[in-house]
Amino acid sequence: QAIDWLEQGQTIWLCTVLSTFGSSPREPGAMMVAKADGAHVGSLSGGCVEEDFLDRLVQGEYTLPSVVIRYGGDSEENRNPKVKLPCGGALEVLVEKRSPESHFVDQLRTLLQRLSSGEALEREVGLAGGNVSLHPVDDHGSRVIWEQGSETIKIVVAPVARLIL
């Protein structure tokens, strides 16, 4: 869907769950793509998190190429006080704003092609300018590699494992 929206000339916001603490229905690496009118595919957590994110997106809040947002927890970094997660849980999400003029659609096509052939890729995202590079990866261990304060986030995108009986 992200490729279609970009090809239609629409800006998209690609969101990736970076970390969770406590109760969370999605694990790190879960993704959602949205556009300015609030249309979206995928999920970050379910319910109130998506609702809050999409409300803020429609209001024009996410203007940077990439930013990490936090929901829940007791941290002062929680800029979403109206969203409380169960049992003191916390969720950190990478939000990437991508315009149709960027080379990002080519990266998405490459990613889709590799996934279709059973290969995994690592997306390396720079927080300062939102630059993204793709790298082959053999180890499918951690889906997200990021230390708070680091300017680089590595996200492993791999084909979904299937059990055939």
Please place each PLM-identified region on the residue numbering:
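Segments forming oxygen-rich coordination pockets for charged ligands
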Residues: 1-165
